[in-house]
Protein backbone atom coordinates (compact mmCIF):
# COMPACT_ATOMS: atom_id res chain seq x y z
CA UNK A 1 0.00 0.00 0.00
CA UNK A 2 1.40 3.39 -1.01
CA UNK A 3 0.83 6.57 0.99
CA UNK A 4 1.54 10.16 0.07
CA UNK A 5 3.82 12.34 2.14
CA UNK A 6 0.77 14.42 2.93
CA UNK A 7 -0.95 11.36 4.43
CA UNK A 8 2.13 10.51 6.48
CA UNK A 9 2.36 14.03 7.86
CA UNK A 10 -1.31 13.95 8.83
CA UNK A 11 -0.63 10.77 10.83
CA UNK A 12 2.77 11.53 12.33
CA UNK A 13 3.39 15.26 12.00
CA UNK A 14 6.35 17.04 10.45
CA UNK A 15 6.65 19.45 7.54
CA UNK A 16 6.95 18.64 3.84
CA UNK A 17 9.68 20.15 1.70
CA UNK A 18 8.91 19.12 -1.87
CA UNK A 19 6.03 17.25 -3.47
CA UNK A 20 3.32 16.46 -0.91
CA UNK A 21 1.76 13.97 -3.36
CA UNK A 22 4.93 11.85 -3.63
CA UNK A 23 3.93 8.26 -2.81
CA UNK A 24 6.00 5.77 -0.83
CA UNK A 25 5.20 2.13 -0.16
CA UNK A 26 8.07 1.12 2.11
CA UNK A 27 11.35 2.10 3.73
CA UNK A 28 14.99 1.47 2.89
CA UNK A 29 18.47 2.77 3.76
CA UNK A 30 19.67 5.88 1.95
CA UNK A 31 22.13 3.96 -0.22
CA UNK A 32 19.59 1.29 -1.23
CA UNK A 33 16.25 3.13 -1.47
CA UNK A 34 14.33 3.49 -4.71
CA UNK A 35 11.82 6.08 -5.94
CA UNK A 36 8.89 4.41 -4.13
CA UNK A 37 10.69 4.20 -0.79
CA UNK A 38 11.23 6.47 2.19
CA UNK A 39 14.71 6.77 3.72
CA UNK A 40 15.91 8.63 6.79
CA UNK A 41 18.97 10.53 7.98
CA UNK A 42 19.61 10.10 11.70
CA UNK A 43 23.37 10.72 11.70
CA UNK A 44 24.76 13.81 9.91
CA UNK A 45 27.94 11.96 8.96
CA UNK A 46 25.85 10.25 6.26
CA UNK A 47 24.67 13.55 4.80
CA UNK A 48 26.59 12.86 1.59
CA UNK A 49 24.36 9.82 0.99
CA UNK A 50 21.35 12.13 0.82
CA UNK A 51 22.99 13.82 -2.15
CA UNK A 52 23.14 10.55 -4.08
CA UNK A 53 20.12 8.61 -2.82
CA UNK A 54 17.40 7.50 -5.22
CA UNK A 55 14.77 7.52 -2.46
CA UNK A 56 11.44 9.15 -3.21
CA UNK A 57 11.66 11.06 0.06
CA UNK A 58 13.91 11.40 3.08
CA UNK A 59 13.12 12.00 6.74
CA UNK A 60 15.51 14.70 7.90
CA UNK A 61 16.11 17.04 10.84
CA UNK A 62 15.82 20.81 10.21
CA UNK A 63 19.51 21.48 10.89
CA UNK A 64 20.60 18.74 8.47
CA UNK A 65 18.33 20.06 5.74
CA UNK A 66 19.96 23.47 6.19
CA UNK A 67 23.41 21.90 5.82
CA UNK A 68 22.26 20.06 2.71
CA UNK A 69 20.88 23.21 1.12
CA UNK A 70 24.08 25.06 1.93
CA UNK A 71 26.08 22.31 0.23
CA UNK A 72 23.85 22.43 -2.87
CA UNK A 73 23.46 26.21 -3.19
CA UNK A 74 19.93 26.11 -1.83
CA UNK A 75 18.62 23.95 -4.66
CA UNK A 76 16.42 20.89 -4.04
CA UNK A 77 18.80 18.95 -6.31
CA UNK A 78 22.43 20.00 -6.45
CA UNK A 79 25.08 18.90 -8.93
CA UNK A 80 25.91 15.78 -6.92
CA UNK A 81 22.31 14.74 -6.22
CA UNK A 82 20.61 11.92 -8.13
CA UNK A 83 17.43 13.93 -8.78
CA UNK A 84 14.74 16.10 -7.23
CA UNK A 85 14.26 15.02 -3.64
CA UNK A 86 11.37 15.38 -1.23
CA UNK A 87 11.68 15.66 2.53
CA UNK A 88 9.64 15.26 5.66
CA UNK A 89 11.30 17.58 8.15
CA UNK A 90 11.06 16.37 11.73
CA UNK A 91 13.13 16.89 14.90
CA UNK A 92 13.66 13.14 15.34
CA UNK A 93 13.90 11.29 12.00
CA UNK A 94 14.86 8.01 13.67
CA UNK A 95 11.72 7.86 15.85
CA UNK A 96 9.60 8.98 12.88
CA UNK A 97 11.10 6.15 10.81
CA UNK A 98 10.24 3.65 13.56
CA UNK A 99 6.60 4.74 13.65
CA UNK A 100 6.25 4.65 9.86
CA UNK A 101 7.89 1.21 9.73
CA UNK A 102 5.43 -0.14 12.29
CA UNK A 103 2.54 1.35 10.32
CA UNK A 104 3.64 -0.43 7.12
CA UNK A 105 4.01 -3.71 9.04
CA UNK A 106 0.52 -3.31 10.51
CA UNK A 107 -0.96 -2.53 7.09
CA UNK A 108 0.68 -5.60 5.57
CA UNK A 109 -0.22 -7.99 8.41
CA UNK A 110 -3.81 -9.21 8.46
CA UNK A 111 -5.25 -9.31 11.98
CA UNK A 112 -5.56 -12.75 13.51
CA UNK A 113 -9.04 -13.93 14.31
CA UNK A 114 -9.72 -14.16 18.04
CA UNK A 115 -10.34 -17.55 19.55
CA UNK A 116 -8.72 -20.57 21.16
CA UNK A 117 -6.91 -23.19 19.07
CA UNK A 118 -8.32 -26.70 19.60
CA UNK A 119 -4.96 -27.99 20.83
CA UNK A 120 -4.64 -25.35 23.57
CA UNK A 121 -5.17 -26.33 27.21
CA UNK A 122 -7.18 -23.73 29.12
CA UNK A 123 -8.07 -24.47 32.74
CA UNK A 124 -11.79 -23.91 33.42
CA UNK A 125 -10.82 -21.57 36.26
CA UNK A 126 -8.83 -19.29 33.92
CA UNK A 127 -10.33 -16.12 32.45
CA UNK A 128 -9.67 -15.56 28.75
CA UNK A 129 -11.08 -12.50 27.00
CA UNK A 130 -13.20 -13.19 23.92
CA UNK A 131 -10.90 -10.96 21.86
CA UNK A 132 -7.74 -12.90 22.78
CA UNK A 133 -5.88 -15.09 20.27
CA UNK A 134 -4.72 -18.38 21.80
CA UNK A 135 -2.44 -20.39 19.51
CA UNK A 136 -1.61 -24.10 19.21
CA UNK A 137 -0.53 -26.02 22.31
CA UNK A 138 -0.77 -23.00 24.61
CA UNK A 139 -1.28 -23.78 28.31
CA UNK A 140 -3.17 -21.41 30.61
CA UNK A 141 -3.44 -22.59 34.21
CA UNK A 142 -6.13 -22.01 36.83
CA UNK A 143 -6.73 -18.46 37.98
CA UNK A 144 -4.79 -16.90 35.13
CA UNK A 145 -6.31 -13.84 33.46
CA UNK A 146 -5.79 -13.18 29.75
CA UNK A 147 -7.06 -9.68 28.98
CA UNK A 148 -8.48 -8.12 25.80
CA UNK A 149 -6.49 -8.41 22.59
CA UNK A 150 -3.73 -10.61 23.99
CA UNK A 151 -1.94 -12.89 21.51
CA UNK A 152 -0.37 -16.09 22.82
CA UNK A 153 1.59 -17.88 20.10
CA UNK A 154 2.31 -21.60 19.90
CA UNK A 155 3.50 -23.40 23.04
CA UNK A 156 3.24 -20.39 25.34
CA UNK A 157 2.85 -21.31 29.03
CA UNK A 158 0.93 -19.11 31.49
CA UNK A 159 1.08 -20.24 35.12
CA UNK A 160 -1.65 -20.19 37.72
CA UNK A 161 -2.82 -16.80 38.93
CA UNK A 162 -0.81 -14.87 36.36
CA UNK A 163 -2.27 -11.86 34.55
CA UNK A 164 -1.37 -10.92 30.97
CA UNK A 165 -2.32 -7.30 30.29
CA UNK A 166 -4.43 -6.11 27.38
CA UNK A 167 -2.82 -5.97 23.97
CA UNK A 168 0.25 -7.99 24.95
CA UNK A 169 1.91 -10.39 22.53
CA UNK A 170 3.83 -13.47 23.68
CA UNK A 171 5.82 -15.21 20.95
CA UNK A 172 6.28 -19.01 20.67
CA UNK A 173 7.60 -20.92 23.66
CA UNK A 174 7.57 -17.96 26.04
CA UNK A 175 6.81 -18.96 29.63
CA UNK A 176 5.35 -16.86 32.42
CA UNK A 177 5.31 -18.77 35.70
CA UNK A 178 2.65 -18.56 38.40
CA UNK A 179 1.76 -15.38 40.26
CA UNK A 180 3.20 -12.87 37.79
CA UNK A 181 1.67 -9.66 36.45
CA UNK A 182 2.40 -8.59 32.89
CA UNK A 183 1.24 -5.07 32.08
CA UNK A 184 -0.61 -3.94 28.96
CA UNK A 185 1.02 -3.93 25.53
CA UNK A 186 3.97 -6.07 26.59
CA UNK A 187 6.01 -7.85 23.93
CA UNK A 188 7.70 -11.04 25.14
CA UNK A 189 9.79 -12.82 22.55
CA UNK A 190 10.34 -16.51 21.91
CA UNK A 191 11.86 -18.58 24.67
CA UNK A 192 11.77 -15.88 27.33
CA UNK A 193 11.11 -17.11 30.87
CA UNK A 194 9.44 -14.82 33.39
CA UNK A 195 9.12 -15.87 37.02
CA UNK A 196 11.51 -18.80 37.28
CA UNK A 197 13.05 -19.35 40.72
CA UNK A 198 15.64 -16.87 41.90
CA UNK A 199 19.10 -18.21 42.71
CA UNK A 200 18.70 -18.57 46.46
CA UNK A 201 20.38 -21.28 48.56
CA UNK A 202 21.32 -21.24 52.25
CA UNK A 203 24.63 -22.93 53.13
CA UNK A 204 24.29 -25.68 55.73
CA UNK A 205 27.80 -27.11 56.09
CA UNK A 206 29.97 -28.18 59.02
CA UNK A 207 33.66 -28.96 59.14
CA UNK A 208 36.50 -27.92 56.85
CA UNK A 209 38.32 -29.32 53.85
CA UNK A 210 37.70 -32.96 53.02
CA UNK A 211 35.84 -33.35 56.32
CA UNK A 212 33.22 -30.81 55.30
CA UNK A 213 29.69 -32.21 55.25
CA UNK A 214 26.24 -30.81 54.59
CA UNK A 215 24.45 -29.26 51.65
CA UNK A 216 22.88 -26.18 50.11
CA UNK A 217 19.29 -25.66 51.27
CA UNK A 218 16.99 -24.23 48.61
CA UNK A 219 15.23 -21.02 49.67
CA UNK A 220 11.67 -21.00 48.33
CA UNK A 221 11.06 -18.03 46.07
CA UNK A 222 7.59 -16.88 47.06
CA UNK A 223 7.55 -13.49 45.34
CA UNK A 224 6.59 -12.97 41.72
CA UNK A 225 7.47 -10.68 38.82
CA UNK A 226 5.63 -7.46 38.03
CA UNK A 227 6.11 -6.06 34.53
CA UNK A 228 4.81 -2.57 33.75
CA UNK A 229 3.11 -1.31 30.58
CA UNK A 230 4.85 -1.16 27.20
CA UNK A 231 7.77 -3.38 28.21
CA UNK A 232 9.60 -5.47 25.61
CA UNK A 233 11.56 -8.58 26.64
CA UNK A 234 13.91 -10.25 24.17
CA UNK A 235 14.24 -13.87 23.14
CA UNK A 236 15.62 -16.29 25.74
CA UNK A 237 15.82 -13.61 28.41
CA UNK A 238 15.14 -14.77 31.97
CA UNK A 239 13.69 -12.71 34.80
CA UNK A 240 13.68 -14.47 38.18
CA UNK A 241 10.82 -14.19 40.64
CA UNK A 242 11.49 -12.46 43.96
CA UNK A 243 12.44 -14.33 47.10
CA UNK A 244 9.70 -12.64 49.12
CA UNK A 245 8.62 -9.47 47.28
CA UNK A 246 8.29 -9.17 43.49
CA UNK A 247 11.02 -8.51 40.99
CA UNK A 248 9.83 -5.33 39.24
CA UNK A 249 10.31 -4.16 35.66
CA UNK A 250 8.89 -0.65 35.36
CA UNK A 251 7.09 0.87 32.39
CA UNK A 252 8.62 1.10 28.93
CA UNK A 253 11.77 -0.87 29.82
CA UNK A 254 13.34 -2.52 26.76
CA UNK A 255 15.36 -5.70 27.33
CA UNK A 256 17.39 -7.40 24.60
CA UNK A 257 17.94 -11.13 24.01
CA UNK A 258 19.62 -13.48 26.49
CA UNK A 259 19.63 -11.09 29.43
CA UNK A 260 19.58 -12.46 33.00
CA UNK A 261 17.83 -10.45 35.71
CA UNK A 262 18.11 -11.91 39.20
CA UNK A 263 15.53 -12.05 41.96
CA UNK A 264 14.36 -8.90 43.78
CA UNK A 265 15.77 -6.55 41.15
CA UNK A 266 13.99 -3.36 40.20
CA UNK A 267 14.58 -1.91 36.73
CA UNK A 268 13.47 1.72 36.42
CA UNK A 269 11.22 3.11 33.72
CA UNK A 270 12.60 3.69 30.21
CA UNK A 271 15.84 1.83 30.91
CA UNK A 272 17.30 -0.23 28.05
CA UNK A 273 19.44 -3.35 28.54
CA UNK A 274 21.46 -4.83 25.66
CA UNK A 275 22.02 -8.52 24.96
CA UNK A 276 23.83 -10.92 27.29
CA UNK A 277 23.93 -8.49 30.20
CA UNK A 278 23.66 -10.06 33.64
CA UNK A 279 22.14 -8.34 36.66
CA UNK A 280 22.53 -10.11 39.99
CA UNK A 281 19.83 -10.23 42.63
CA UNK A 282 18.52 -7.33 44.71
CA UNK A 283 20.01 -4.69 42.43
CA UNK A 284 18.13 -1.47 41.68
CA UNK A 285 18.63 0.30 38.36
CA UNK A 286 17.23 3.80 37.98
CA UNK A 287 15.17 5.43 35.24
CA UNK A 288 16.47 6.09 31.74
CA UNK A 289 19.62 3.99 32.24
CA UNK A 290 21.47 2.23 29.41
CA UNK A 291 23.22 -1.09 30.09
CA UNK A 292 25.60 -2.22 27.33
CA UNK A 293 25.88 -5.73 25.96
CA UNK A 294 27.50 -8.39 28.16
CA UNK A 295 27.82 -5.96 31.07
CA UNK A 296 27.76 -7.58 34.50
CA UNK A 297 26.23 -5.90 37.55
CA UNK A 298 26.81 -7.34 41.01
CA UNK A 299 24.03 -7.94 43.48
CA UNK A 300 22.75 -5.49 46.10
CA UNK A 301 23.98 -2.37 44.29
CA UNK A 302 22.07 0.71 43.11
CA UNK A 303 22.48 2.60 39.86
CA UNK A 304 21.02 6.10 39.80
CA UNK A 305 18.91 7.59 37.03
CA UNK A 306 20.58 8.24 33.66
CA UNK A 307 23.55 5.95 34.33
CA UNK A 308 25.19 4.43 31.23
CA UNK A 309 27.25 1.24 31.55
CA UNK A 310 29.30 0.46 28.45
CA UNK A 311 29.54 -3.02 26.94
CA UNK A 312 31.47 -5.73 28.81
CA UNK A 313 31.87 -3.54 31.90
CA UNK A 314 31.68 -5.00 35.39
CA UNK A 315 29.90 -3.04 38.12
CA UNK A 316 30.74 -4.10 41.68
CA UNK A 317 29.54 -1.09 43.67
CA UNK A 318 26.70 1.42 43.60
CA UNK A 319 26.85 4.27 41.07
CA UNK A 320 24.36 6.88 42.28
CA UNK A 321 25.51 9.71 39.99
CA UNK A 322 24.39 10.02 36.37
CA UNK A 323 27.20 9.49 33.86
CA UNK A 324 28.99 7.03 31.61
CA UNK A 325 30.95 4.24 33.30
CA UNK A 326 33.44 1.84 31.68
CA UNK A 327 35.64 -0.97 32.93
CA UNK A 328 36.05 -3.00 29.75
CA UNK A 329 39.44 -3.30 28.03
CA UNK A 330 39.02 -2.24 24.37
CA UNK A 331 40.29 -4.49 21.58
CA UNK A 332 43.84 -3.76 20.42
CA UNK A 333 46.42 -5.50 18.25
CA UNK A 334 47.20 -8.94 19.69
CA UNK A 335 50.90 -8.24 20.11
CA UNK A 336 50.18 -4.94 21.85
CA UNK A 337 47.76 -6.69 24.20
CA UNK A 338 50.38 -9.33 25.08
CA UNK A 339 52.93 -6.61 25.86
CA UNK A 340 50.42 -4.78 28.03
CA UNK A 341 49.52 -7.99 29.85
CA UNK A 342 53.21 -8.63 30.55
CA UNK A 343 53.53 -5.15 32.02
CA UNK A 344 50.51 -5.71 34.23
CA UNK A 345 52.00 -8.97 35.53
CA UNK A 346 55.20 -7.11 36.44
CA UNK A 347 53.59 -4.06 38.06
CA UNK A 348 54.37 -5.36 41.55
CA UNK A 349 58.08 -5.76 40.75
CA UNK A 350 58.18 -2.37 39.02
CA UNK A 351 56.58 -0.75 42.05
CA UNK A 352 59.22 -2.27 44.34
CA UNK A 353 62.02 -1.08 42.05
CA UNK A 354 60.60 2.45 42.01
CA UNK A 355 60.30 2.46 45.80
CA UNK A 356 63.92 1.29 46.07
CA UNK A 357 65.06 4.04 43.69
CA UNK A 358 63.12 6.65 45.64
CA UNK A 359 64.71 5.44 48.89
CA UNK A 360 68.18 5.55 47.34
CA UNK A 361 67.61 9.03 45.94
CA UNK A 362 66.31 10.25 49.29
CA UNK A 363 69.38 8.81 51.03
CA UNK A 364 71.68 10.40 48.46
CA UNK A 365 69.94 13.71 48.94
CA UNK A 366 70.41 13.42 52.69
CA UNK A 367 74.17 12.71 52.27
CA UNK A 368 74.62 15.68 49.93
CA UNK A 369 72.92 17.90 52.46
From Swiss-Prot:
**Which residues carry out catalysis?**
263
The family assignment reads: Belongs to the transferase hexapeptide repeat family. LpxD subfamily.
Q: Which reaction does it catalyse?
A: a UDP-3-O-[(3R)-3-hydroxyacyl]-alpha-D-glucosamine + a (3R)-hydroxyacyl-[ACP] = a UDP-2-N,3-O-bis[(3R)-3-hydroxyacyl]-alpha-D-glucosamine + holo-[ACP] + H(+)
Under HAMAP family, the record lists:
LpxD (MF_00523)
Q: Tell me the keywords, alphabetical order.
A: Acyltransferase, Lipid A biosynthesis, Lipid biosynthesis, Lipid metabolism, Repeat, Transferase
Q: Which GO terms describe its molecular function?
A: N-acyltransferase activity
Q: Name one Pfam family in it.
A: Hexapep_2
What biological function has been recorded for the protein in this entry? Catalyzes the N-acylation of UDP-3-O-acylglucosamine using 3-hydroxyacyl-ACP as the acyl donor. Is involved in the biosynthesis of lipid A, a phosphorylated glycolipid that anchors the lipopolysaccharide to the outer membrane of the cell.
Q: How does it assemble?
A: Homotrimer.
Going by the record, the broad EC class of this enzyme is transferase
Biological process annotations from GO = lipid A biosynthetic process
**Would the keyword Lipid metabolism be found if you checked this record's keyword annotation?**
yes
The protein's matches in Gene3D superfamilies, at most eight in alphabetical order, are given as: 1.20.5.170, Hexapeptide repeat proteins, MurE/MurF, N-terminal domain
Spell out the InterPro entries in the cross-references.
Hexapep, Hexapep_transf_CS, LpxD, Trimer_LpxA-like_sf, UDP_GlcNAc_AcTrfase_non-rep
Q: Which NCBIfam families match?
A: lipid_A_lpxD (TIGR01853), PRK00892.1 (NF002060)
Provide the disulphide bond pattern.
none
Matching PANTHER family, A to Z?
A: UDP-3-O-ACYLGLUCOSAMINE N-ACYLTRANSFERASE (PTHR43378), UDP-3-O-ACYLGLUCOSAMINE N-ACYLTRANSFERASE 1, MITOCHONDRIAL-RELATED (PTHR43378:SF2)
Concerning CDD domains, the annotation shows:
LbH_LpxD
Pathway(s) per entry:
Bacterial outer membrane biogenesis; LPS lipid A biosynthesis
**Name of the protein described by the UniProt record:** UDP-3-O-acylglucosamine N-acyltransferase
Instruction: Report the GO terms under cellular component.
Output: membrane
EC code(s) of this entry: 2.3.1.191
Amino acid sequence: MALTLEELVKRFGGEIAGDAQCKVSGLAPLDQAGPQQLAFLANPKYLSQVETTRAGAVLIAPKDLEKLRAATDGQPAGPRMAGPLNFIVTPNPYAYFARVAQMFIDLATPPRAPGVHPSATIDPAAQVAASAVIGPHVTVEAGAVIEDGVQLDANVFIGRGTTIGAGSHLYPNASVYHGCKIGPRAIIHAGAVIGSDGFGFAPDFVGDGDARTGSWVKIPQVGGVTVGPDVEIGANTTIDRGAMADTVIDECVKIDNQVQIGHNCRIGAYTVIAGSAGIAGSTTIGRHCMIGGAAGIAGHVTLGDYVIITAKSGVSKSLPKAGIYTSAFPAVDHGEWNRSAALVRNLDKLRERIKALETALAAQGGTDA
